[in-house]
Amino acid sequence: MLACYFVVEMKRGVSSLQLSKIVGVTQKTAWFMLQRIHNCFSIEIKEPCLKGEIEVDETYIGGKNKNRHSKDKVKDAQGRSLKDKTPVFGTLQREGFVVAYVVTDTKGKTLLPLIYNTVHPNSTIYSDEWYAYNGIDKEKFDHQKVYHKKGAYVIGRRSTNTIEGYWSHLKKMISGTHFWVSRKHLQRYVDCESFRYNTKHLSESERFDVFLQNTKRRLRYSQLKKITA
C-alpha cells in the first residue's frame, strides 16, 4: 500500500530505484511492483467520452542523438522518424480529460479511428497541419487547424497548447524520473501520467481513492467523470 501511495501521489512518479529504497526491496522487485501498479492507471473506453473543444496531437518518445556518443547516434532519426522514437497520440478535452495511446505510426488510418472512438460527434477538433488529420470527417466534426510551420500557434480559440503542455509533463516524468522506458512498457507510463492529469483537481486522498477503486475493476471514463465531478 505504501508503494501505491508514493507512485500515485508523487508529481513526477517514482523510479524503481527510488521505490526499492522506500519499501526495502531489490530494484528488480521494485520494478515489477511498479509495473503492477501502473497497470491500475488504465481506464476502459467503451464509447466516445470527450466532447466540446478537443485538441488532438502526436508526440515522439525516445532518446536524442545529441545525448549520444558519435558511434551510438542513429542515422536519419530526426523529426517524425520512427527509427529511434515511439509515437504517442492524444485527444484532450479542454477543461476535461485526456486520452493518450502509444501507436505504431501517425498515419490517418491509425489516428482517425482513435479520434472517432473517443470524441463525440459535433465536437470542435483543433489540430496542427499534420496530413493525417485531413481525413477527419467534416460532417461529424468542426475541424480547425493551426499552422505551426507558418509560425501560428494561437488563432482565437484555435490552438493545441493544452495537449502540448500534457506532452511536456509526460516527457519530464519519463526523462526526469525513469530516464528511459522501453516501447513495450511505454503505454503504462502514459496511462500513469494521464491518470494524474485527469485527477489533478482532486485532493490526495480523493485521488488515491479513485486509484483503489480501479484496482478492483477497470473503471470506464464515464465512471471516472462521475467520481471526479
Task: Enumerate the language-model features and the residues they cover.
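Residue-level recognition of single "structural anchor" positions
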Residues: 1-229
